[in-house]
């Protein structure tokens, strides 16, 4: 009997202890909200951007534009042009979600990001009308969910569209800045699901393809009307040829099948994933600025580093312009290493795992360079520029011999 009571006491203590951990981590991290009071200026950009960033470790979304023309830039860790040659391999822009609400021109701008549950909210106010939305990239499914609503009098019309990267996103300044041929399509199904895809299959070492599809509630063409008390929701699904045999059909199907009950489960699992993530370790210090930056860094890492074979590029998942500087590659010095320094001490092992994969994939090439360059057989000498799946971003090529003879 005493043994049974002891076991019960241990169970109750464990439950209380777990509840205490949840409460402590939530109390610390919920204090930290990232606030933007004006639209970002450095987007699209070949480097890092100054925009609100969302992601799930596979897909990244960067928010741009004024209230009347919100743009969601979409990129994926596994969507590259993959060719072992200098300046021919780099991460790509998949596409853009363009949310147009002309009546909001001149409205105030406020975007806030809550780190604890990885949810972003926006509020735009003009005169006696306000439009707001809540959005997140699901941590457990490759989905972006956006819920729009309005306050005030009357109604507001809007339109959502998917677009491929254009002149702002793709640099074309030959001979040094080259554009390589891709296949692409943007369209709408008879059921009103918007979709687009891009693929790089010509003159590459490894073919790549990525797709996204968006469905807007009660809309057959992307148009919608906001009225007080009547929220409108849109769902966008993402995939690639590395995650699905037919990524286009996959995203169209998943966007079509997102019922209200399913999305409630998606949000629940999303919140649970982030709650578990923050409980892996947490700390509170007297310096609130440093503490906030610490948790912001962990938020960013969880948002971009979960795909083992495809680590985030040098600027994270959030690619908004092609070609990113330094090909956006895994520069095998502190540039690739530094983002992972604190992940073991903070117990974020899942986010650290992708670090090793580009180097492991280059072992056979490293053996070749070791013997050819140093005369040491069975050694490993890696190039400075690496991509995923054994790709070299700095391999000698006719282009290199022509324009970089020094």
Segments from the language model and where they lie:
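Hydrophobic alpha-helical segments
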Residues: 4-6, 54, 294, 336
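Active-site lining segments of carbohydrate-active enzymes
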Residues: 347, 354-406
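Bacterial Sec-dependent N-terminal signal peptides
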Residues: 1-23
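Acidic/polar, glycine-enriched structural segments that form the non-catalytic walls/loops
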Residues: 15-330, 348-355, 359-371
């Amino acid at each position: 009997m005493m043994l049974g009571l002891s076991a019960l006491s241990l169970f109750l203590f464990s439950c209380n202890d777990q509840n205490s951990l949840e409460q402590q981590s939530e109390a610390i991290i919920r204090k930290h909200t990232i606030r933007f009071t004006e639209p970002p200026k450095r987007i699209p950009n070949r480097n890092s951007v100054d925009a609100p960033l969302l992601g799930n470790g596979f897909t990244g979304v960067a928010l741009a534009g004024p209230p009347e023309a919100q743009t969601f830039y979409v990129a994926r860790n596994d969507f590259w042009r993959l060719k072992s040659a200098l300046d021919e391999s780099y991460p790509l822009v998949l596409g853009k979600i363009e949310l147009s609400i002309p009546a909001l021109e001149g409205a105030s701008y406020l975007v806030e990001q809550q780190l604890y549950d990885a949810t972003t909210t926006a509020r735009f106010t003009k005169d006696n009308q306000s439009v707001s939305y809540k959005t997140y990239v699901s941590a457990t499914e490759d989905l972006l969910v956006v819920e729009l609503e309005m306050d005030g009098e009357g109604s507001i019309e809007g339109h959502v569209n998917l677009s491929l990267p254009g002149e702002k996103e793709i640099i074309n300044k030959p001979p040094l800045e080259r554009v390589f041929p891709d296949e692409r399509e943007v369209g709408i199904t008879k059921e009103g699901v918007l979709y687009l895809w891009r693929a790089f299959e010509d003159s590459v070492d490894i073919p790549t393809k990525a797709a996204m599809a968006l469905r807007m509630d009660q809309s057959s063409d992307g148009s919608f009307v906001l009225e007080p008390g009547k929220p409108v929701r849109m769902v966008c699904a993402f995939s690639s040829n590395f995650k699905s045999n037919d990524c286009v059909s996959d995203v169209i199907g998943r966007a079509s099948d997102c019922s209200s009950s399913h999305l409630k489960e998606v949000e629940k699992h999303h919140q649970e994933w982030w709650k578990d993530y923050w409980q892996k370790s947490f700390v509170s210090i007297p310096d609130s600025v440093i503490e906030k930056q610490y948790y912001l860094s962990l938020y960013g890492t969880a948002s971009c580093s979960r795909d083992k074979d495809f680590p985030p590029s040098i600027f994270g998942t959030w690619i908004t312009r092609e070609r990113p500087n330094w090909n956006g590659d895994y520069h095998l010095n502190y540039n690739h290493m530094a983002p992972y320094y604190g992940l073991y001490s903070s117990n974020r092992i899942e986010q650290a795992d992708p670090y090793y994969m580009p180097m492991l994939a280059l072992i056979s090439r490293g053996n070749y360079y070791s013997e050819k360059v140093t005369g040491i057989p069975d050694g490993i000498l890696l190039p400075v520029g690496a991509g995923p799946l054994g790709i070299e971003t700095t391999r000698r090529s006719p282009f290199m011999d022509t324009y970089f003879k020094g």
